[in-house]
C-alpha cells in the first residue's frame, strides 16, 4: 500500500474543536483501538481494563452475537459457529486457504470471496470483520463519550486490492468513516519515530497472527520514507500454532480429530507457544472427545526445531527488502519488532543474529500499530499537531498493461511513492482499428504470462485511422489506500473508458513467491524473451505493411522486383517461426532493404495524386 501525507491535510473549519478519531489495528489474532489524548497516543481498554480484543466472533442461538473474549470462551464447544482469524480469509477463495482442511469451518466458495456457513446463516469475511470493527467502535465511543469522526484502519503492506477493498467494506458495514487505510509497518514507524525522535535507516519486522511484513524505512528530521517493502501475506503466528498443533496430533497418535478436538488442540497449541515466551518448558493437557487424555511436555528446543523452517522463511522477505533498498544489514540503525509473534525468543534471536544487533522492543509489539494509526487518525481528523511531519510510502509491486506480443509495459514501477498518477501514450497496431482491449497487470516480469492479471476493459469508438496514427493515453492512479483506477482516452475524439481495479481473489502464496523472487531469478531470461517478442512484433508490423502495399500498388514493381520482395516477406515469416532474435532482426532488415525502391515509387505516386488538378499557385 502507499501513503503520502504532508503536515496537516484537511484541516478542520473549526480548528479549536477536537474531533474524535481513532486508529484501529484489525489483527488476525487480536484487534485494538487507540486514540490521541493530550498529545499522546493510548490504547482504549474495555470496561474491565483489557486492551486486546480477540479477533473472534461467535454466532449463537436466536441471533445472539458474541465478539472477543466471550466468543473465545466458546470456540472449543462450538467450533463451527465461532470464527477465528477471519482476516486470513479476506479477499480469498477456498483454493487460496492453504490449511482449509484442518479448519473446523464449513466453507462455501462463493464468487469473489469464500464464505462460511454458521448458525446465523452464510457469513462473508467482510461481515465477520465488520462485527469486530463494530465492537471496537462501540468501545471507543463509550470511552471517549461521543461519536467518532473517523478511523484509520491498518492492513498488512502485502494486502492486495481485493483485501484492501474488503477491509473498507467491513468498516463501512460497521458504521465507520474510513479516513485512510494504513500499512501496519508504516503505522509502527509513526509510533516509533514520533515517540522516540529516531533518525536513520530502520527495518520494521512485523510478524502478526497471519501475515509477515518487512519495511525498510528512512527517518530524517520528521520525514518518514519507505525505501522498500516485502513480505508474505500467508505467514504468521497462526502458522507456528499449526506446527505445534500437528506436533500434538503426532505425539498423541490422533489421525482423524473431530472438529471439537481440532479447535481444542489449536487453542492448546497457541497457549503452549505463548507460555514458552517466558518459560523454558510447559505442559500441554487436554481431554479429547473420545475420552483420550493428553499430557505432554513442550520445551523451547522442541518448539524451535518444529518451527525452524518458518523462522528461516521470515528472513527471505528481509533479504528481498534490503536488496530492493540497496542497503546492507550492517547499515541498519535498528530493527523494530511488531506483532505478538515477535515475542517468541527464537524469532528475536534469528533477527538479532541476521542484523548483528538486538531488535528494538521498547514499545509493546501488540500495541505499536494501533498507536501509530491513532496518531495518523488524529492528523487526518484535523486536530492540531505540535510537530509537522512527512510520510512517504511506496507501491510494493509494479503496475502496467499488456502490449503486442504478450509483453508487459510497466506504467508505475514498484517502490514508487504514492498516491501517484502516471500516464503513457499508446497507439493502434492495425489499420482501421476502432477498439482497444486494456489488460491491467501486476508484477515484475517482462511477459504477461508471468504477471498477475488484475482486470480487463475495452476502449471503443476509436476513429478509424492507419496503424500508429491514433493516440490513446492510459492513466494509472493509485490512491492513498493503494487502490488502483485505470483510464484510457483517445486523444482526438475524446472517447474514454475506465475501471476501478478490485480483483476477485487475493494473491496465493505461490503467486506472491513467484512475483517477488522469480523476477530476480529470471532477469536475463526475461530480457532475452522481451527482445525476441519486440523483434517479432516489429517484424509482423513490417510484413503486414508490405503485404498491404503490394495489394494496393503492386503494379509499381516488375515481376523480378515483386519476387524479391515476396521472398523477403517469406524470410521474415520463416525467421518468426524459428524464434531466434538475431534471425528475426536480420530478416526485418533485409525486408526493409528489399522494399526501399518500392517505398520510393509509392511516395512519388502519392505526391502525384495529391498534386493532380492543382496549380503551383494553389500550393
From Swiss-Prot:
Superkingdom of this protein's organism: Bacteria
Gene3D superfamilies, per database record: 1.20.1270.10, 3.30.420.40, Actin, Chain A, domain 4, Substrate Binding Domain Of DNAk, Chain A, domain 1
Cross-referenced InterPro entries: ATPase_NBD, Heat_shock_70_CS, HscA_NBD, HSP70_C_sf, HSP70_peptide-bd_sf, Hsp_70_fam, ISC_FeS_clus_asmbl_HscA
SUPFAM superfamilies, per the entry: Actin-like ATPase domain (SSF53067), Heat shock protein 70kD (HSP70), C-terminal subdomain (SSF100934), Heat shock protein 70kD (HSP70), peptide-binding domain (SSF100920)
The keyword Nucleotide-binding belongs to this UniProt entry's keyword annotation: yes
Molecular function as annotated in GO: ATP binding; ATP hydrolysis activity; ATP-dependent protein folding chaperone; unfolded protein binding
Pfam families: HSP70
GO biological process: iron-sulfur cluster assembly
UniProt entry keywords in alphabetical sequence: ATP-binding, Chaperone, Nucleotide-binding
Function: Chaperone involved in the maturation of iron-sulfur cluster-containing proteins. Has a low intrinsic ATPase activity which is markedly stimulated by HscB.
Family statement drawn from the similarity comment of this UniProt entry: Belongs to the heat shock protein 70 family.
Entries under NCBIfam families matching the protein: HscA, PRK05183.1
Name of this chain's protein: Chaperone protein HscA homolog
Gene label: hscA
